[in-house]
Amino acid sequence: GSEADITPAVLAAIQSSDVIIGYKYYFRFITHLLREGTECIDTGMKREQARAEQAFAYANEGKTVCVISSGDAGIYGMTPLIYEMKKESGSEIEIESYPGISAFQKAASLLGAPIGHDFCVISLSDLMTPWELIEKRIHAAAMADFVTAIYNPKSEGRYWQLYRLKELFLQERKPETPVGYVRQAGREEQEVFVTTLADLDPEQIDMFTVVLIGNSQTYLSGNHMITPRGYYGEIKQKKMDTGIGQDIMIRSFRTIEKELKNQKIPLDKKWALLHAIHTTADF
């Protein structure tokens, strides 16, 4: 992302730290923001555990340490590892986590409004997760009609997974489903593309790209993807056409619940009771 996307809380944390630890590529974006005398520890790729260990080592010396990640550190970032390491080591070091703007959020803003309804995020990296599990998640997302953001779509040694994802989505979605992808979101090299599921070319995607696949309601307006919330058009009409029975049930449940003399019934038993009374109309 860009410097403008750094939240004030994150900026304050960076500027109040004695030590900054992170992947060496990220320092190019924040070095000019650091206060004088800040110690910077940079490491290469796949050195996450070493970075976490260094962070605890410096913190044990009484220093304020900031571990940086791109986007939101809690989304495929360093935050989970830091908390896991604290648990495993029994450390008493205090941890504070600050939210950031994740790559899929930045990409979505550049593409229009593609995640206006239910969505999920899937990483295609099988470094930590077996591909069999990733494929199950892909199939579930496609079948459930989620707008789907794709992280880590390709790498130097991993290319076929995106082809497989496209194949799986085409089993559940129409070929004309809008798809957007953004390379280097928020950076000078930024590129924004809109296409369809059928025309998505995995060869145009690299490791710095985030892909967003629309759901069955997503449409294109110019170069923008829009996933409606349901205020207009087909979704609202479908709700009117199919929601009568559901509306009756909801109103019935509310009426029954108000009439219950015992309001302290455990929720699992109350749920079964509401169903039974509603079904028999015994109220």
Predicted regions and their residues:
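Gly/Ser/Thr-rich loops at beta-strand to alpha-helix junctions
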Residues: S2, G71-Y76, I101-A103, S155-R158, ...
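A contiguous loop/helix-start segment that scaffolds small-molecule binding in enzyme catalytic cores
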Residues: T64-V65, M143-R251, H275
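Class I S-adenosyl-L-methionine
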Residues: G1-I95, D201, K238-W271, H275
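Class I SAM-dependent methyltransferase SAM-binding "motif I" and its flanking Rossmann-like core
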Residues: I75-A144
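Conserved beta-strand scaffold positions in the cores of enzyme catalytic domains, especially
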Residues: C40-D42, I95-S97, V121, V179-Y181
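Short gly/ser/thr-rich secondary-structure transition/capping motifs
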Residues: G1-D5, M128-W131, F193-T195
